[in-house]
C-alpha cells in the first residue's frame, strides 16, 4: 500500500489535477524518443510544429453530441474514432437557410454549369444545361464581337457536359441518351474551325473523350461487352492512359462475373505501371482474381512478381509525406494521393498459401520461413508460423516463442520458450527466453510466476543484453500488482546501479511517469489528513532532473526538461518553470527551440519580468515567424494577458505583416519575382526548360505538356475519373517539382484543373525553393494559391449563416482535406470538412436536409454546410471559445469542455496539455493556417 499525498494544485484553476494529462504527455514523449523515423509523433509536451506545410489531417469530426453540457471527466472520445459525447446539448443554432449555389460573377451560363458541377449540385446543373439546349446561344451571350459558334457546336458542348453531369450523379442511362444525341450532332459539325467558343477543335476533343464517357455509361447500365469495346476505342486515341483504363476494364468484367477477362485486363494494367507500388497493387488484385478461379499455379507466379517488385520500392519517393519538408508530417489517405507501403511479409505468407494450394509444399514452406525472418512482429509471420507448425516443419523454438508473444498467443509462447531453455540451456538467448516467459505470464495475469521468471534473469544472467529490460519489467510488474511506489524504487535502483545500461534513462523517465500517475488515484478529501513527505509532482520532478543531470545525452533528457517545465508552469511555480526552460534552451538548443523560447517567455512574464518576456517573444517571432510558437510569440509580444483570445487577436496582428514592396497581388508581379530565383541545379531533369522559340517563359514547357502522366492525368480529371487522374498528376508533379520553370506553370494548371492539393503543394514548394523560404516573403499571388479560398461562395455564405469566421472555416478545411472533396480518413470521415457519416446523419436531421445519404458528404455543397453548422454547434457547446471549438471538432466536445475548464482562460496551456498528440498538432496547424489566411485576406 502507498500512502496518500497532497494533490497537485494549480494557481490557474484551484484544485487542478494534472496527472492524467502529464502522464499521457510523458508517455507520448517517451514513445517519440524511442522512434526516430520520419513518421514518429512529435514530442508531446512542447511540439515545435514547423508551419505552414500543407498537411492533411488524420482527424475525424466527433459524433454530434447529445449528452450533458458539462461533463465531469474526459469521455472515451478519441480523435480518430469518437465513441461518446455529452448527453444534453445546448440549444442548437437555428438551421441556416441553404446557401444559394451561385458562382462568382460575372459568369456565362456554361461557366455557371461548370461551377454547379464542381460543388456537386448536379440537379441544378442539369436543369441549366437542358434550358441551354432549348436556346444554345444563351450559353455564349447574344451579343458578341466575334462570330458565334455554330448551333451544332454549342449543342454538342452542352450535351457533352450533360453526359458528364449524369455520370457524376450516377444516372448512366440519361448519360447514354445525351451521348447518343452528341454522336448524331457530330454528323452536322462544320469542318473548319471558328474563333468562337467552343471551337471545332474542342468538339473534336469532346468526340474522342465521348468514347470514354460512352463506355462509362454502358458499364453503368450493365452492357459490359459494349463498354469494353468503347474503352478500347478510346485507348486507340489516348494510349497514355492505358494502364488506368485497363484496370477500369477489369472492373467492368468483374461486375458481370467475367473473371478470366478481368485477369487479362489486370495483367495489361500491371504492365503499364510506372512505380513498384502501383505494379504491386495491380498484381495483388490479379492474384486475388486468379485465386478465386482456382488457378493457383498462375497465382504463385504473380506472387513471385510481387516479391521481386517489392525490392525496388525503397528507392521510390514517399508520395504521402515527403513533400512537406518536415519529418513529423502524417498524411491522411486523401483519395487519389495515398501511396501504401509494400508489406513484403504479407505477400510471402499469401504466396505460401498459393504454393500449398498448387501442391508445392516445399515452396510453400520456404516462403513461410522467409515471412518469419522478414518481420516476426506481424500478423503474417504468426499466420505463417501456424502453417509451419501444422505441417510439423521445424522452426527455431526461440523465434517461435517470440512470434507467439508478439501475437499475444501467450500459452504457446511459454511452451516454446520453456522447450528452448530445456533443449539449449547454454544458449546465449536463454536469458531472453526467461524474459519472454515472464512477459507472456504478465499477459496472462500470472503475477507471481512472472516475478519468479524475471528473477531468473536478474539472478542467473547478469551479462544478458536483456538485463535492463528485465529490470524495467520487474518495476512494471510491481506497479501492476498494486505497488507503484515499489516499482519506482526498482526503476531508481536500476538507474543508480547500472548507469551504463542503455535503458537507465528510460527507467528514470518511467519512474517520473509513475509518480505523476500516482496522483490520479488519491482521495482529495482525505489527502490533507495524511502525512506525506513528498508530493507526487515533486517526486516526478526529482526523477526528471536526475535524468537530465545524469544522462544529458540521452534521448529523453530534453523531453524531461520540457515536461518538468510545463508541469511547473501549470502549478504556478514560474521560477522553477523558467529555470527548466532556460536549461532546455542552453543544454539542448536543437531539441525544441521554439517551444522552449515561448514558454520561457511565458514563465518570465508570469514572474513580472515583462520586458524580458517580450524580448524573448520578439526574437522568436523574428527568427521563426511561420512556426506555431513563432506566431504565438508575435501575438504575445504586445499582450497584457498572454495565452488568451488567440483567434480574436489574430486578424489585427496578421494583417500588420507587410507585403513585398510594390506587390499588387498580380500574376505579373509574381512572375517578375520568380525571375529572380536561382537557376535549378544542372543535374535535375530540367527538360522543362526546352521551350521552343516564341513561347513565353512561364508557359507550360513542351516536355511537361507531353509528359504521359501529366497528359493522362489531365484527361482523366476532365472525363470524371478524378482519383485516377490525380494519381498520374502526382507522378508528373514529382518529376518536375524542383524545377521552378516547370513547377510554376504546373501549379497554374493544377489550380485550373481543381487539383487542389497539388496546386497547394506546388505553390508551397515553389516558395520553399525561393531565397526567402517563407510564405509571407513570397508574392501575394503565390500566397493565395498556397492558402486558397476554394469554394468561396459556399464557405462565405455558410459561415455567415451560422456566424462563424469564414477564414477560420477555410483554415479548418485546409487542415482537414487540403480542399479535396473526396478526402476520407481512416475513421471514415468524409469530404472537405471531414464529417463522420453518423454525425452527418444527425446534422441532416437537425437541418431537415432532404434525401440525405452518406455519399452526399463528398459533395462540397453539402459538406461545407454541414461542417460550418457543426463547428458552430461545437463552439456554442465549448464556452463559445474558438480554440476549444476546434479541439471539440477533432477530439469530441465533451473532452474539449473538460480540458478547457482545467486551464481556462489560458489557451496556450490548454493546447500544450491536450492528451492526444494528434489533436495538439491539429490545433497548432490550424492556428498557423489561420494566421496566414488572416494575413493574406485581411490586408
Annotate each PLM feature.
Residues 866-870:
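An active-site-proximal "capping" alpha-helix that borders the catalytic cofactor pocket
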Residues 22-31:
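Bacterial N-terminal signal peptides
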Residues 852-862:
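A short, structured beta-strand-centered segment in the mid-to-C-terminal lobe
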Residues 913, 924, 929-939:
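Gram-negative outer-membrane assembly/targeting C-terminal domains
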Residues 1-16:
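N-terminal secretory signal peptides that target proteins for export/translocation
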Residues 855-856, 878-885:
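Short, charged, surface-exposed loops that flank catalytic or proteolytic processing sites
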Residues 31, 35-815, 819-827, 833, ...:
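Acidic, polar-rich low-complexity tracts and alpha-helical solenoid repeat scaffolds
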Amino acid at each position: 500500500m502507498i500512502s496518500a499525498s497532497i494533490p497537485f494544485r494549480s494557481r490557474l484553476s484551484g484544485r487542478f489535477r494534472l496527472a492524467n494529462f502529464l502522464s499521457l504527455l510523458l508517455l507520448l514523449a517517451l514513445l517519440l524518443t524511442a522512434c526516430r523515423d520520419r513518421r514518429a509523433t512529435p514530442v508531446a509536451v512542447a511540439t515545435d510544429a514547423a508551419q505552414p506545410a500543407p498537411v492533411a489531417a488524420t482527424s475525424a469530426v466527433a459524433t454530434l453530441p447529445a449528452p450533458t453540457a458539462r461533463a465531469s471527466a474526459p469521455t472515451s472520445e478519441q480523435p480518430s474514432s469518437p465513441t461518446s459525447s455529452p448527453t444534453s446539448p445546448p440549444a442548437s443554432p437555428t438551421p441556416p437557410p441553404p446557401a444559394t449555389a451561385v458562382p462568382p460573377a460575372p459568369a456565362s451560363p456554361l461557366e455557371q454549369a461548370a461551377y454547379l458541377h464542381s460543388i456537386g449540385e448536379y440537379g441544378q446543373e442539369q436543369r441549366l444545361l437542358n434550358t441551354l439546349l432549348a436556346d444554345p446561344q444563351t450559353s455564349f451571350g447574344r451579343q458578341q464581337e466575334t462570330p458565334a459558334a455554330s448551333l451544332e457546336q454549342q449543342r454538342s458542348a452542352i450535351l457533352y457536359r450533360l453526359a458528364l453531369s449524369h455520370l457524376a450523379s450516377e444516372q448512366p442511362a440519361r448519360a447514354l441518351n445525351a451521348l447518343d444525341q452528341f454522336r448524331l450532332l457530330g454528323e452536322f459539325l462544320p469542318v473548319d474551325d471558328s474563333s468562337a467558343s467552343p471551337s471545332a477543335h474542342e468538339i473534336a476533343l469532346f468526340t474522342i473523350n465521348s468514347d470514354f464517357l460512352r463506355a462509362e455509361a454502358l458499364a453503368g447500365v450493365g452492357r459490359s461487352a459494349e463498354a469494353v469495346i468503347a474503352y478500347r476505342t478510346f485507348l486507340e486515341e489516348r494510349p497514355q492512359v492505358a494502364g488506368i483504363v485497363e484496370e477500369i476494364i477489369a472492373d467492368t468484367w468483374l461486375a458481370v462475373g467475367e473473371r478470366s477477362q478481368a485477369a487479362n485486363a489486370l495483367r495489361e494494367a500491371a504492365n503499364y505501371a510506372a512505380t513498384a507500388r502501383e505494379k504491386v497493387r495491380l498484381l495483388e488484385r490479379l492474384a486475388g482474381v486468379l485465386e478465386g478461379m482456382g488457378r493457383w499455379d498462375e497465382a504463385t507466379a504473380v506472387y513471385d512478381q510481387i516479391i521481386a517488385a517489392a525490392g525496388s520500392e525503397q528507392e521510390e519517393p514517399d508520395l504521402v509525406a515527403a513533400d512537406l519538408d518536415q519529418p513529423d508530417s502524417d498524411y491522411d489517405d486523401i483519395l487519389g494521393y495515398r501511396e501504401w507501403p509494400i508489406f513484403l511479409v504479407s505477400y510471402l505468407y499469401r504466396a505460401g498459401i498459393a504454393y500449398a494450394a498448387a501442391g508445392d509444399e516445399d515452396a510453400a514452406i520456404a516462403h513461410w520461413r522467409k515471412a518469419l525472418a522478414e518481420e516476426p512482429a506481424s500478423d503474417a509471420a504468426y499466420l505463417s508460423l501456424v502453417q509451419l507448425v501444422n505441417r510439423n516443419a521445424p522452426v527455431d523454438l526461440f523465434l517461435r516463442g517470440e512470434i507467439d508473444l508478439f501475437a499475444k498467443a501467450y500459452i504457446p509462447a511459454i511452451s516454446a520458450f520453456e522447450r528452448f531453455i530445456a533443449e539449449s540451456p547454454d544458449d546465449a538467448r536463454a536469458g531472453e527466453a526467461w524474459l519472454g516467459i515472464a512477459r507472456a505470464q504478465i499477459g496472462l495475469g500470472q503475477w507471481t510466476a512472472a516475478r519468479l521468471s524475471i528473477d531468473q534473469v536478474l539472478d542467473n544472467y547478469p551479462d544478458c543484453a536483456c538485463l535492463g529490460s528485465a529490470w524495467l519489467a520487474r518495476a512494471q510488474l510491481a506497479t501492476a500488482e498494486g505497488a507503484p511506489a515499489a516499482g519506482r524504487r526498482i526503476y531508481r535502483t536500476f538507474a543508480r546501479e547500472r548507469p551504463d545500461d542503455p535503458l537507465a534513462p528510460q527507467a528514470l523517465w518511467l519512474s517520473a511517469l509513475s509518480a505523476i500517475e500516482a496522483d490520479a488515484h488519491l482521495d482529495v478529501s482525505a489527502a490533507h489528513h495524511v502525512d506525506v513527505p513528498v508530493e507526487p509532482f515533486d517526486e516526478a520532478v526529482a526523477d526528471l532532473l536526475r535524468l537530465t543531470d545524469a544522462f544529458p545525452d540521452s534521448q529523453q533528457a530534453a523531453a524531461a526538461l520540457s515536461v518538468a517545465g510545463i508541469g511547473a508552469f501549470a502549478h504556478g511555480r514560474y521560477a522553477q518553470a523558467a529555470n527548466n526552460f532556460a536549461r532546455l534552451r542552453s543544454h539542448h538548443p536543437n531539441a525544441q527551440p521554439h517551444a522552449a523560447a515561448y514558454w520561457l517567455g511565458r514563465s518570465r512574464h508570469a514572474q513580472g519580468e515583462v520586458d524580458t518576456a517580450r524580448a524573448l517573444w520578439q526574437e522568436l517571432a523574428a527568427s521563426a515567424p511561420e512556426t506555431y510558437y513563432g506566431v504565438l510569440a508575435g501575438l504575445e509580444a504586445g499582450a497584457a494577458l498572454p495565452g488568451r483570445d488567440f483567434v480574436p487577436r489574430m486578424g489585427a496582428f496578421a494583417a500588420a505583416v507587410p507585403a513585398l514592396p510594390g506587390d499588387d497581388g498580380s500574376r505579373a508581379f509574381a512572375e517578375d519575382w520568380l525571375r529572380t530565383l536561382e537557376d535549378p541545379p544542372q543535374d535535375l531533369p530540367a527538360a522543362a526548360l526546352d521551350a521552343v522559340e516564341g513561347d513565353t517563359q512561364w508557359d507550360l514547357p513542351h516536355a511537361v505538356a507531353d509528359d504521359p502522366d501529366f497528359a493522362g492525368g489531365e484527361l482523366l480529371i476532365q472525363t470524371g475519373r478524378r482519383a485516377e487522374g490525380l494519381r498520374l498528376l502526382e507522378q508528373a508533379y514529382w518529376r518536375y517539382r524542383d524545377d521552378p520553370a516547370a513547377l510554376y506553370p504546373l501549379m497554374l494548371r493544377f489550380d485550373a484543373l481543381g487539383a487542389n492539393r497539388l496546386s497547394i503543394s506546388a505553390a508551397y514548394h515553389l516558395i520553399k525553393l525561393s531565397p526567402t523560404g517563407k510564405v509571407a516573403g513570397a508574392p501575394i499571388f503565390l500566397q493565395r494559391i498556397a492558402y486558397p479560398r476554394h469554394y468561396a461562395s459556399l464557405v462565405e455564405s455558410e459561415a455567415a449563416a451560422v456566424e462563424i469566421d469564414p477564414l477560420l472555416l477555410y483554415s479548418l478545411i485546409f487542415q482537414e482535406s487540403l480542399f479535396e472533396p473526396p478526402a476520407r480518413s481512416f475513421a471514415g470521415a468524409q469530404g472537405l470538412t471531414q464529417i463522420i457519416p453518423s454525425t452527418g446523419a444527425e446534422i441532416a436531421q437537425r437541418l431537415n436536409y432532404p434525401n440525405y445519404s452518406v455519399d452526399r458528404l463528398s459533395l462540397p455543397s453539402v459538406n461545407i454546410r454541414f461542417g460550418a453548422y457543426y463547428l458552430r454547434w461545437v463552439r456554442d457547446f465549448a464556452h463559445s471559445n474558438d480554440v476549444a471549438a476546434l479541439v471539440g471538432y477533432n477530439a469530441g466536445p465533451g473532452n474539449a469542455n473538460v480540458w478547457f475548464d482545467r486551464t481556462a482562460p489560458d489557451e496556450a496551456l490548454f493546447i500544450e496539455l491536450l492528451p492526444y498528440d494528434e489533436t495538439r498538432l491539429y490545433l497548432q496547424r490550424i492556428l498557423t493556417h489561420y494566421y496566414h489566411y488572416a494575413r493574406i485576406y485581411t490586408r
